[in-house]
Amino acid sequence: MEEPPEEKPKVIGGPYNFWLYSPVSGYDITHPKSVSAPKVYPRLTCKTGSTHLTLAPNRTALVVVDMQNYFLSPALHRPPNSAGLQIAEKLKNVVIPACRKKKIPILWLNWGLTPLDILAMPPTVKRGFALDNNFVHGYKAPKLGVDVGPVQLEGGFTIDGGRVLMRDTWNEEIYDPLAALVVRGTDMKVYKNRLSGFTADTETDKALKSRGIRTLIFAGCNTDQCVAATLMDAAWLNYDCILLSDATATTSPKFAQEAVEYNMEGLDFKMTCKDLVNGQRVAGDVDF
């Protein structure tokens, strides 16, 4: 007995920006030219919750938020067994290799300040950094732009740590074990000067649009702060957003992570690292 044909997919959105949904195949967020246009290839189908999600890998980017030496390195008195370091290991061993294999571009989104940024920084941001207590050995959070002095790394050698989160300093750089994975000339790196990476004077939106990116997969820390702020702004700028739930972490209480994950159920999408790794990529003629 032949299976009944799949019903016509439901259109969610408008004529120029829409998803297609079918109870059988789940959500299609590949963004063909029109509802009646041929399917977009290549395409990648992943599990998300109780349904499936199909995206266009070359219109998608992994956004890695704030995985920087300042926030992660034990050399700066950060905890040696932090949730952020566990996320770094997962990115190194699972997520980034999966994105390379599936040909999903990567954008590294980092705090990177200029002297003008320090002068213009609002009290709310300065206060937030001053309240950071995710340090060991009684170390107190230095102010933005303050020189952290010499830093002793593994192996016993010492480097200049630089001023806190100022551009082109060691503490601002991508966390050392992850920096080794950056592909120069292929990966994107963008500086931000607020929790969100989409403020008016950042290059995030421009960098993504120049690559034709429509869908963003978020990883990094802190989930309820910089990740969530960037994700929400991205959604309002018409990007499709996916939270990689077990590749994000926060120093906040557990309920803060849970709240962001809960909100993603109604905003856009959530998936796990395993869902991404197991995603099925189908090649074909690309419809742009």
Identify the residue ranges that each predicted region occupies.
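Short, conserved beta-strand edge motifs with alternating hydrophobic and charged residues
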Residues: 64, 107-110, 190-191
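A short alpha/beta connector and helix-capping loop motif
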Residues: 58, 75-111
